[in-house]
Amino acid sequence: MPSGTGTSACYLAKHTDLRVFTAPCVGDSDYLKKQIYELDKDSKVQILNPPKKYHFGNLYKELYEIWLEVCKSGVEFELIYDPVGFMTLFANLDKLGSEILYIHQSGILGNITQKQRYERKLKIKDHK
């Protein structure tokens, strides 16, 4: 699951027997570790690094493209955190088991304006 402060990942790991993996979307892995540690010093959350640094809220063509691809599943994902989560997931498949549960944890209302930003700034058209 993608994380800002890691709160959802921390409490999911604390209260289930699942192996919980998260990806930093707001800061780097050190920032995320610190945030999680403040909530639970014994947290078992495993942090996976994205394939490259994405600055929060900035537009990246590859993030929009992966978002379009995963939305073909019939589920609309959020356009800021989820693309970083999926890029990280796909880059780290070798570290994960054969069964993966991706937790969709965020709203999609912001997608309207985020798509407009992509269309305006990067000249990307909605292919859905």
Language-model features and meaning:
Residues 1-128:
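PLP-dependent amino-acid enzyme catalytic core
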